[in-house]
Amino acid sequence: MNINIKQVSFVILGLVIVTIIFGLSKFNIATAAKKDGKKFDDWVVSCTPGNKETKTPEVCLLSQQLNLTQDDKQQPIALFQVGYFGPEKALKMIQTLPLGVRLEAGTSIISSKKLIAPGKYTTCTQAGCQAVASISDADLKTLTSTKENSVAFMNLEGKQLTLPISIKGIEKGLKYIK
């Protein structure tokens, strides 16, 4: 039996290359991962890693926190998170607002004094109450075309309160997480 060293080394090299390519694609090393904490002006990326066992995909959101300064201490009063949800990748905003809100009234995303997206409360925890608002392409266009954006809600006494939302960086951030 006559073994050609060149043929054997060629076959082994080929197997090594195929194994490396398969390994990189299997572990997604070849694709760029989203960076948790990456900033887009007033928005920050926060990602929840995917789980292969439960077939849960990675979810990344843009977050913006509003703080109130009291006695030289910053206290969070609201958290706005924007991201794409579900298989249809629907754009939604999760609004975490302080406790003491009127739940049945819901929330409103307002742009230039125009109501563009109503939000419905889904749950309340010790951290606050969460409302979810669906944002259409037209709503996003309206939001990004003006600097006067806010989320409105009612307190327990029935008084409407509004909190500002900065859209600075949201377009670049949404392209990044999509």
Regions inferred by a protein language model and the residue ranges of each:
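A generic "folded-domain core" signal
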Residues: 2-14, 18-178
